[in-house]
Amino acid sequence: MGEPTFYFGYGSNLDAEDWAAWCRARGADPTAMVEVCSAWLLDHSMRFHYRSKGRGGGAADVVQDARGTAVPGALFTLSEEGWNLMNRKEGHPNVYHQTPVQVITAQGEAVEAVTYVVQPAQQRSELVAPTQAYAALIRDGLVKRQLPIGHLNSSIKHLDAKSTIDHVFVYGTLTV
């Protein structure tokens, strides 16, 4: 059996209750997605340039950006049914499409994963503000994992906000 394909989740997919409610509404099992650990999608920033009919406002996307930018999120494993459900939830391939990415775990390990990115035809050239409820789902998911929310707050207000990493700590560099 091959190695698992990991899913990098960001945005509302960081909220377990939102995922579970979406699954239950469709008679599906939410345990088809299991969290592994927190992770960062490097050289990307979050954008709100897509209007979700289901959310009634802007929905999160990740876009390739300058070196030193990063989007916090989480790595998950999905069963085959989990991938089918996630594809359906994300409107794959018409709204969001699967994209291979490399993420860095909180432990510093580089991991190959798949995430979902908004199709160019669905992107708007202006900021599409999310609802307060949708932003709260994302914020709560980040806070639960002790991940920063500054990038989220900026991207809600500015289309071209940068999710810049402005500090680095390297283990083993301290001397006594």
Segments predicted by a language model, with ranges:
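Glycine-aromatic micro-motifs
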Residues: 2-176
